[in-house]
Amino acid sequence: MKRWLTILIIISSTLTFAEKRALVIGIGTYAPDSGWDAINGDNDIALVQEMLQANGFSLNHIATLQNEQATYQNIQQALCALCQSAQKDDVIYIHFSGHGQQITDINHDEEDGYDESWVPYDAPIQPSDTYYGERHLTDDELNHSLSSLSQKVGTNGKITVISDACHSGTGTRKIGETNIRGTSAKFLLTETTKAQYTPQQEHWLHLSACMDGECNRQFIHDGKAYGSLTYALYLLRDQLSTSSAKELIKLIETQLNKLVRRPQTPQLEGSEACKKATIL
């Protein structure tokens, strides 16, 4: 009997159980000298937390970075911590609500010559003699972190990235219209201190708020502004664990047309296998 008990204890100590883990970043106000307009990305955090909890995420496993907490360094550290804690078969959800910007592609993997980037709290809108884009979080850098995460969770795990930002869609912004995320001004580099990464095959889903050339408008509810993509996901929270990503993107587009009543086409990137699965 003691022998069986010992074997049982050894076996049970090696078992790991899949968890649902999330990182939610919301920026409404940027550093005073950054040049960025205030938006309401920080309002999205509570919606995302409620949405995730409705889909089995424990609040203890939902890390958040809000406004001045969401510096480039803190975001990178949070991604690293998420990777360190991730286990095989885990479900990973990463959500960014804030400004986005196109930045010069330094490793020449983009056809148009520009990387997409998330704009952390401390990233200026323009280059200068002392700033060369090192605090813009490019898609190459994010993909590097996601590749590490993908290795940790394995083929049965899930990784979903939501970008409620806009990288190039404000070229049609009307004078005085501030309810839009992102900028049409590209961040042009002649030199950079950023590391270069080799493009990796993507084993994750990336859902963004709109196509290039479209505006990502915020949605106003009871006098409070939210990201339109975030709010659409919140309204569809009961279907996030049951509908495939392909089915979900159609539902999201329908919701966006109702919410903002302007052309806004959400984009879904990832492998075909990921698109056929649920996002959570």
Model-derived features: positions:
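Sec-dependent N-terminal signal peptides
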Residues: 4-12
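Cysteine endopeptidase catalytic domains of the caspase/legumain-like
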Residues: 14-280
